[in-house]
Amino acid sequence: MLENLWEVRQALPIYLLTATIGLAVSCCFTLICPHVCRLIPALTTYGKAADQLEENSLVARISVPKKWFKHFYALGLLTLLLCLHCIHSLIHNPDFLPTIPIKFLTILTRSYSIPPIAPSTAVLALLLITFHVARRLYETLFVSVYSDSRMNVFHYIVGIVHYIILPISIMCETQGVITKKEIFHVSVDDITLTQWAGAVLFWVCNWKQHQIAEQIANTRKGPRGLIRNYAYGICFGRWFNLVSCPHFLFEICIYLSLLLVIPTAYVYRFVVLFVCVNQTFAALITHSWYHKTFPKYPKTRKALIPYVL
């Protein structure tokens, strides 16, 4: 079992599991004992939660603007379009991919005689993720109103790596991509009702998250849509009456709903685990910041999950 775990072909799961554990431990330090090591909170927080950190610290000096979130989605969208182009080419020419990219994909996951993701399923999943990433890019460019808040370079690099890994985690387990034993066939008829249900749920969660992004942006805009201020405020209404970070909640739901579309995926499960841990701790840290910053912050409001957490 240990030999299988540390096999070279498990490069992506090992990276994702290591990143998840490291993130969880660091965030626990930030929440429980932030003054023990000031470097850890500096590495695990960004935006409003990081504004109170010492400006002369090394991490603060090598930080980047929070508005650079758009780089995540731009590079992620480019990677997704390249993956979709490869799949489109494989439909017409099974030998389209040269040897080097195939060897690269094979070291990212377990060795399979037949990879677990069918071509039709992979196409549906990649199209859904493309929609999600394109929507997030649109929001960062035209909806969200960013202040002068910053994020550390470590967080920036992890974000870029995440959105590049996301489509690759599906490509490296798609039949006909890393092996030539299967016919690369794509058909709508191959998609099951459960997978369609997952796709609908994925879209609904994206729609809800977009509404929340607009709601957050409107707290800094006037009646005519012009930017009024860059100050942080308390959001009210809809999901904000229940939790402090509904956008983080729906981010988790988006990734979980995709599991209904690609239930046989192996690497993607580690992506989901990383996202769940990341968004949960981000919500807890943000929730704590709200309570410290606003004395009259609603006491009944939870951080992430209504009535629970």
Swiss-Prot record:
Presence of the UniProt keyword Chaperone in the record: no
Topology with respect to the bilayer: Multi-pass membrane protein
Entry's Gene Ontology molecular function annotations: polyprenal reductase activity; polyprenol reductase activity
Catalytic activity: a di-trans,poly-cis-dolichal + NADP(+) = a di-trans,poly-cis-polyprenal + NADPH + H(+)
Gene Ontology BP term (one): dolichol metabolic process
Keywords associated with the record: Endoplasmic reticulum, Membrane, NADP, Oxidoreductase, Transmembrane, Transmembrane helix
Protein name in UniProt: Polyprenal reductase
Organism of origin: Caenorhabditis briggsae
